[in-house]
Amino acid sequence: MSEKSIVREAKDIRLAMELITLGARLQMLESETQLSRGRLIKLYKELRGSPPPKGMLPFSTDWFMTWEQNIHSSMFYNAYRFLLKSGGSVGIEAVVKAYRLYLEQCPPVKDQEPILALTRAWTLVRFVESGMLQLSVCTKCNGSFITHAHQPASNYVCSLCQPPSRAIKKRKLSANPADINLQLLDGLEQFRM
């Protein structure tokens, strides 16, 4: 009979608390810690004040392909890849650090969830590792973006270089100072010779 390590359990509890605080779903907690489902539910209720949401995890690569989600997913995954290459982090630690970097660069709008939730970011890493998604380089800006695996990359153009028309409409409605500055610059384009 294997004896439970108190140190291992303490690390799992600390990790579970950090993941819950960042918005992880129960399935992610079960996968990344060795704590029982009952203990995780108890911990979740204690930290969040409500039971964890029920239901299956998202299992579609298509979510990552829509223009806005793709930009956010690509930002997260590039941060994750940098952390792996620099040797500073691996596994769930790299996911958490990359997600914190993502939130720092793309803070959610007040009273709204971030576009890329932690569980989706974790799922993205698993999709890339399993070969369902990949990074492709944009032929215009040379940025690396998430695409379907085995998609021809020779003519790939990202949604920043070639935004869909609905993206431009959304930007014009935005109160975000960065978007307003871009709108002003767009307006000045007509005066260029």
Curated annotation (Swiss-Prot):
GO terms for cellular component: cytoplasm. GO terms for molecular function: DNA binding; zinc ion binding. Its main location: cytoplasm. Its cofactor is Zn(2+). Zn(2+) binds at residues 138, 141, 158, 161. GO terms for biological process: bacterial-type flagellum organization; positive regulation of DNA-templated transcription; regulation of bacterial-type flagellum assembly. The keyword Iron-sulfur does not apply. Keywords: Activator, Bacterial flagellum biogenesis, Cytoplasm, DNA-binding, Metal-binding, Transcription, Transcription regulation, Zinc. It is found in: Cytoplasm. Binds 1 zinc ion per subunit. Belongs to the FlhC family. Heterohexamer composed of two FlhC and four FlhD subunits. Each FlhC binds a FlhD dimer, forming a heterotrimer, and a hexamer assembles by dimerization of two heterotrimers. Functions in complex with FlhD as a master transcriptional regulator that regulates transcription of several flagellar and non-flagellar operons by binding to their promoter region. Activates expression of class 2 flagellar genes, including fliA, which is a flagellum-specific sigma factor that turns on the class 3 genes. Also regulates genes whose products function in a variety of physiological pathways. NCBIfam families: PRK12722.1. This is Flagellar transcriptional regulator FlhC. It comes from Proteus mirabilis. The gene is flhC.
